[in-house]
Each structure stands twice: as C-alpha cells, then as structure tokens.
Amino acid sequence: MLTSKKEMQSSENKQEENLALLLTNYISYQNIVIFTGGNQFKIRNKKEFTEYTIESNSLFFLAKNTHWDMEIVGIDNSNPYRKIIIDDALIKLLHSISSDDSCYVKKKIFTANLNEMQLNIVSNIITDIKYSGNNKKIFKILYLLSFFNDYNDIVNVILSASSKSIVDRVIKVIELDISKNWKLGDVSSSMFMSDSCLRKQLNKENLTFKKIMLDIKMKHASLFLRTTDKNIDEISCLVGFNSTSYFIKVFKEYYNTTPKKYNGVYSITQGTLP
C-alpha cells in the first residue's frame, strides 16, 4: 500500500509528539514515587540487565542513588506525570514507627498497577499532597505507599538509605548557588575535606562531581522552563552558562530535545526528572 507524503509527515509528527524524555544514566538522588499519568515509562538498568515497562496511570517507586536509562513516552499530554519525594520528615516518622530489625532489600524499583477505583483515590491523594501542610502531607504519602504490594520492602529500602550521604552534602552545597560553576575544590573545601577524599567518596557511589553538577543544573533549567516565563538566555545565565548556544547544546544532549521544544512538546507540569 502506498503512503502519501502528507500521511508520512503526520505519522512522524505524531511520533515526535509522543516522545517525552530520553535520559541516559538517570540517577534518583532521593527516594521517589512517580504517578505515570498519561505517560508510559521504560526503565532499564544495563548493569543488572533488568528492564521495566510501566504503563500510564500507574505508580512506581525508585530507590535513592540508583542508576537507570529512562524513556518517557507521552500518550496523553493533558495528564502529566507527578513526582513525590520521600523527604526527611517522612523518613523520621518511619524510623519512629518501624522495628529495629529491618532487613536489606536488593530490589530498587517497585510498581503498582491501579484499578479504576484505586486510580481515583490516588489522583485525589496526589492533588491533596500538593496543597497539604507538612504533617498532613506525610500521612498522605504513607497512604500512597500502601497501594504497593511490596510496602514493607519499600519501607526497608527507604530506611536503609536514610543516613545523609556524601552525595546529599555535595548537592546541598551546589544548590546554594546554581549559577556558580563550582569546582571540586570549592565544594571539598566547604565540606572540610580534601579533593582526593571527596573524589574517592563519590567514586564509591559510582558518581563523579561533573555528573552531579550536570544533573543539578539540568534539573533547575527544566524547572525554570516549566514554571517561569524566563527566556532561554536568562535561564542559561541562571544555571551558570556563559554561552546560550552551549547551554542549548548541553540541554539537547541531556533531554534529547531543545529548550524551546521542551515546553511545547512535553506537558510535564508536575515534578521533574532528575
């Protein structure tokens, strides 16, 4: 069957609209729960030869400091994904209500498929979380975790990674001024460590200082694009790039699209990756 040029172009445009994000070596620096919304997530761990396809309107949990290749395919752009962070307040509560005999869990990703009734409940919970105060928010997130069959394993994963890591401390310093082009020596000095000691500690986490810097700057760049009316030149400057053209190049390599197309093609208005 012959396909007209117009039909081929329409098909190509549809495919382009459906491709949301393509992230290589994505690192979740915090324990997170993601509601997929109108997106399909394809997640791979090349080191462990594992692959997961998580359909739209589902939940999944990613453990802190784990490495993934991730593709997000937008099926319904009017229904963006949502990211919920497991913060320190919730971790503190989990410590207070959990027994001391928590065990190590090797698995680092958990999924939950939702029926129609559960989907309605989860949607309401996520909306409530956004507008709730800290105490109410904590219990809403706990309720959200209860939709996972592996709830106990997830709690153990969260507790096992609850201590502040060297990566957390590095991120905290960098985010004091994301417009600054931090050097390893700047950060190690502020942490009262030698350069070599900090480098070794990051190597133990399979990370480099350069990788963390890139992830933090790209996270904030995507946030500025989606939550402000700042232009690309302004955003480039805010995240520490002296050249807008170089910022666009780096952004495109990271997110597989240009900053200009990022908002137009991807209706991801809640949460951000990384």
Curated annotation (Swiss-Prot):
Q: What are this entry's molecular-function GO terms? A: DNA-binding transcription factor activity; sequence-specific DNA binding
User: Which keywords are on file for this protein?
Assistant: Activator, DNA-binding, Plasmid, Transcription, Transcription regulation
Q: Which organism is it from?
A: Escherichia coli O127:H6 (strain E2348/69 / EPEC)
Which region is the signal sequence? none
The entry's protein name is Transcriptional activator PerA
Taxonomic lineage:
Bacteria, Pseudomonadati, Pseudomonadota, Gammaproteobacteria, Enterobacterales
Gene3D superfamilies, per database record: Homeodomain-like (1.10.10.60)
Q: Which gene encodes it?
A: perA
Domain HTH araC/xylS-type intervals:
168-265
- For this protein, the DNA-binding region equals 185-206, 232-255
Query: Function of this protein?
Result: Could help in the transcriptional activator of eaeA expression in enteropathogenic E.coli. However, it seems that it is PerC which acts as an activator.
Disulfide bond annotation, renumbered to this chain = none
Instruction: Indicate the transmembrane segments per the record.
Output: none
